[in-house]
Amino acid sequence: MLLTDFDFTISLVDVGDLICGTLAPYPADVLARYARGEAGSRDLWLASFAHVDRDEAVALADRVDIDPGFRDLVAWAEREGIPLAVVSDGFTLYIEHILGREGLGHLPVFANRYVERGRLEWPNGNPACPLCGCCKAAVARRLKASGSRVIYFGDGSSDVYGASFADWVFAKSTLARFLEQNRSPYFPFTGFADALDVLRQNLDRFRDGTMQPRSTLRPHPRCRF
C-alpha cells in the first residue's frame, strides 16, 4: 500500500497555506499557541480556512502544479496492482480539484472537508486527540490492521505521525530531519521520480517484506487512540 501526503509532497507548494495566507491569514495569537504546542492544526484551520470563499480557494488551487513524477508513480502502481491513497491534514476541496484536473480524481483521499464558509468537518479525525484535523497516524494504523504493508511518502510535521505506523518511509524536509534525529531509517527523495526508481528496482523485496531499511520509528508520544 502506497500512502502519500499531498501538500509539498504531491503538490509543489503547500496549497492550504497558500489559500489561508492569501484569503484568511492565520491570527497571530493562534499561530503563537501553535508554535508553543498549545494548539493544533485543527485550531489553525478553524481560525482561517473556515472563513475562505470556496470559489476563490479553488481558483488559487488551480494555479498549483504537481510533481510530474506522481503521475508516473500512479500509473506504475496501477499496473502492478498496488493500491495508492492520499492522506492529508488539508482539505478535499482543493486536493480533489487538483487531482481531478490531472486525471487522478479516482484516487482515494483521506483529508478534512470544507462544507461551506464557517463549517469544516473532520471525517478522519481522532476523538482521542483533537490536535490534527486528519489523523494520519490513525489512517496508517487502520491500513496496517487490514493487513497491508504501508510505504509512506511525506515531508512535513504532521507526517511524523503517519510515518510512525509505516513499514517504510520516503521522506524529505521536516520529516527527514525528524527521522534523522530519531535515528529511524528512511529513503530520501526529492520527488516521486526518485522514489519510483527505488520501488521499481526493489519491488519483490517490498512485496515480501524483506526490503531494508525498514522504519524503526515508534508511535509519537502525542498519538493517542
Task: List PLM regions with ranges.
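Alpha-helical substrate-recognition element adjacent to the catalytic core
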Residues: M1-R113
